[in-house]
């Protein structure tokens, strides 16, 4: 996913490693959003390790873990805050799908559901099952 309004770079990806972060910073990214819960990863990829590596690479770091089937309004709000940080950003989880879902939910009501789902599909993520939630959030003004 590369989008989200304003022409600013927003990307999602599968799990990254601490040693990948200097290259992300060199590529121009400024913000790293970790959507992977600690219980899914080893010690070297947990929140503390990723935060330390991100800070060492000069990246702003946000931890917003998303366990499948457990989306909350606070989680969507936190993702929106992280995505509002200045500069190019990258969010990740195991496959990139959960980060794509959260991105789409933050855009509910700002962009049509069809466009959000199509953007996810163009990046290789099928988030069509989230349509009812996207439309519900949009109808409530998220």
Question: What positions do the PLM features span?
Answer:
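Mobile, glycine- and charge-enriched loop segments
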Residues: 1-13, 20, 59, 138
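A short, structure-level motif marking secondary-structure boundaries and short turns
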Residues: 4-6, 34-37, 101-102
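Residue-level preference for short coil/turn positions at secondary-structure junctions
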Residues: 6, 28, 85-86
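A generic structural signal for short
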Residues: 8-10, 38-40, 105
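Cysteine-based protein phosphatase catalytic domain of the PTP/DSP
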Residues: 13-82
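Glycine-rich, phosphate-binding/catalytic loops in enzymes
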Residues: 48-51, 107, 111
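Catalytic cysteine-centered active loop of the rhodanese-like fold, especially the PTP/DSP P-loop
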Residues: 76-110
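Cysteine-dependent PTP/DSP-like catalytic domain, specifically the C-terminal lobe
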Residues: 109-142
């Amino acid at each position: 996913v590369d989008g989200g309004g304003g022409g600013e770079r927003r990307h999602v990806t599968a799990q990254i490693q601490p040693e990948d972060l200097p290259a992300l910073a060199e590529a121009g990214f400024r913000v790293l959003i970790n959507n992977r819960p600690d219980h899914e990863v080893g010690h070297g990829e947990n929140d503390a390790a990723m935060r330390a590596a991100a800070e060492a690479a000069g990246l702003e770091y946000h931890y917003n873990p998303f366990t499948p089937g457990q989306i909350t309004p606070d989680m969507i709000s936190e993702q929106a805050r992280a995505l509002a940080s200045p500069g190019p950003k990258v969010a990740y989880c195991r496959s990139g799908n959960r980060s794509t879902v959260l991105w789409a939910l933050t855009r509910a009501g700002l962009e049509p559901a069809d466009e959000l789902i199509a953007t996810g599909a163009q990046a290789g993520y099928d988030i069509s099952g989230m349509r009812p939630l996207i439309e519900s959030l949009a109808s409530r003004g998220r």
